[in-house]
């Protein structure tokens, strides 16, 4: 018997089918093969058509089932991971009223800023744990003002994962975790935030019924089953945003555990066992997948924009022509820790939330024409990225998160020995690398929700550990010294 996971990304839809007994992936596919388009009608806007996601899901699902050589009756449950914060609006016929305003669209920033000021910063942070910012509620406020005809026709609002679940099951439901990422959830009262809804003038009727993150959220309809080759009544038993789901995929569920990614941008996602917030709003706090009223489990999310994109820029523009990433790592390894005094601040991909939304751009410090080479630049870029991670993780420490372990997929910058050693050394934390992805995590989440697995520990018992990186005492001291120099240069630049 099998479990199916869908990962609804902004670039593609990924589907994995997992054998429930072995926990191994037996089939996977993704679509589109080229990156999905994002429409930007104006600077700072970003939209996608939710019906395109649904088309991609159907293609990827059929492809994964074909590769796995399974039939619909073999699939016991479906789980969904999705790009966070996007706004989908539908009418009473469940028809999409406008393109989705997705996570990277910034048009709603002024609405969130005004709400933060008018509701009160302290009250927002103590109840919502965040500023309303550029999140889903603020995106809806933009529609209310600029597209009132559409707003008046809205039956329900949804996140991207809610929409795909609706297309599969015909049911419109959401989760506490989803409402919290939209900044609709009052953590102090454990309920929909009446204060925020009243401030924006939203009717409670717009909000979907709440279901558990793990548990029955709907069943595949007869028409969808016939179209996709699924069995009618196949349950959808899990959904979560991509970052909480990535943490689940890495079995990051308890306080002190950290999930990290090092792609174009970087994410550090830590679990906090206390209801807490950053008074400067440098990180965001949402309900984690296993958060309940009885057991606090909050996901503290730190995003760093300038991560893999800096390493890629160095490869294209500074490194010797034709070099690959492994060769770039070898080149960087010829330079000592600290790069003979050279530092790079990796903030050249837009404003950074952990710097209180300041856009300071990327900059090079301590450059000496008689000492420094391309190799120094290659290493300083990776060290600068690591030090940005450390800077953000120190904010998490201030919030009371005692970081015990960092878990990541064996991909992107975590393939670099320099990056791994530097991160372990400067944070004094063990790094564990695993072979997993979001669609696999969603499939296993479905297994938990369907009761096939007793708990996450059983679901992820087969999680394959690729590597463990321990902090090296001598190197750690050198990295910590280099970090202090980097941090001083950052503070002079802010």
Protein language model features and the residues they cover:
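N-terminal glycine/serine-rich phosphate-binding loop of ATP-dependent small-molecule kinases
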Residues: 1-98, 110, 114, 126, ...
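Active-site core segments that coordinate phosphate-bearing ligands/cofactors
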Residues: 3-5, 17, 109, 116-173, ...
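Active-site donor-binding loop signature of nucleotide-sugar glycosyltransferases
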Residues: 31-33, 212, 471
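Flexible loop residues that form catalytic
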Residues: 83, 215, 411
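Carbohydrate-associated surface elements
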Residues: 105
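Divalent-metal (Mg2+/Mn2+/Ca2+)-assisted nucleotide/phosphate chemistry catalytic cores
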Residues: 204
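Short linear loop/turn motifs
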Residues: 208-216, 328-331
């Amino acid at each position: 018997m099998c479990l199916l996971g869908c990962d609804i990304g902004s670039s593609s839809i990924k589907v994995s089918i997992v054998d429930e007994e072995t926990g191994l992936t037996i089939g996977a596919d993704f679509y589109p093969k080229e990156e999905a388009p994002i429409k930007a009608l104006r600077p700072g806007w970003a939209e996608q058509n939710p019906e395109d996601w649904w088309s991609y899901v159907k293609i990827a699902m059929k492809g994964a089932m074909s590769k796995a050589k399974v039939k619909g009756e073999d699939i016991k449950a479906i789980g969904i991971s999705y790009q966070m914060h996007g706004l989908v609006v539908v009418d009473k016929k469940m028809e999409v009223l406008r393109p989705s305003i997705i996570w990277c669209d910034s048009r709603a920033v002024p609405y969130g800023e005004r709400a933060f000021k008018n509701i009160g910063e302290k009250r927002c942070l103590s109840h919502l744990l965040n500023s309303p910012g550029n999140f889903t509620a603020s995106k809806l406020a933009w529609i209310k003002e600029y597209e009132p005809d559409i707003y008046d026709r809205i039956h329900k609002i949804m996140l991207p994962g809610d929409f795909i679940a609706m297309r599969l099951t015909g049911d419109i439901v959401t989760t506490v975790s989803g409402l919290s990422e939209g900044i609709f959830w009052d953590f102090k009262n454990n309920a929909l935030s009446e204060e925020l809804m009243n401030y924006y003038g939203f009717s409670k009727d717009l909000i979907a019924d709440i279901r558990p993150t793990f548990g029955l959220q709907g069943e595949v309809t007869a028409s969808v089953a016939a179209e996709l080759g699924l069995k009618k009544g196949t349950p959808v038993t899990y959904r979560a945003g991509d970052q909480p789901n990535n943490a689940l995929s890495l079995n990051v569920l308890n306080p002190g555990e950290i999930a990290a990614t090092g792609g174009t941008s970087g994410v550090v996602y830590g679990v906090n066992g206390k209801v807490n917030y950053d008074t400067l709003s440098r990180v965001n706090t949402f309900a984690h997948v296993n958060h309940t009223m009885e057991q606090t489990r909050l996901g503290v999310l730190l995003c760093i924009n300038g991560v893999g994109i800096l390493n890629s820029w160095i490869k294209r523009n500074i490194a010797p022509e034709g070099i690959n990433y492994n060769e770039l790592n070898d080149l960087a390894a010829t330079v000592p820790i600290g790069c003979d005094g050279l530092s790079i601040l990796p903030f050249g991909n837009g404003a950074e939330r952990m710097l209180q939304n300041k856009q300071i751009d990327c900059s090079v410090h301590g450059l000496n024409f008689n000492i420094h080479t391309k190799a120094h630049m290659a290493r300083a870029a990776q060290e600068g990225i690591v030090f940005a991670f450390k800077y953000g993780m120190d904010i998490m420490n201030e919030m009371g998160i005692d970081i015990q372990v960092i878990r990541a997929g064996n991909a992107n910058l975590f393939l670099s020995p320099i990056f791994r050693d530097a991160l372990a050394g400067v944070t004094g934390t063990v790094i564990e690398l695993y072979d997993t992805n979001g669609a696999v995590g969603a499939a296993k989440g479905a297994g938990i929700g369907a009761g096939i697995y007793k708990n996450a520990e059983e679901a992820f018992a087969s999680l394959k550990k690729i590597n463990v990186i321990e902090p090296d005492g001598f190197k750690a001291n050198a990295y910590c010294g280099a970090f202090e120099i980097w941090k001083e240069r950052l503070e002079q630049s802010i």
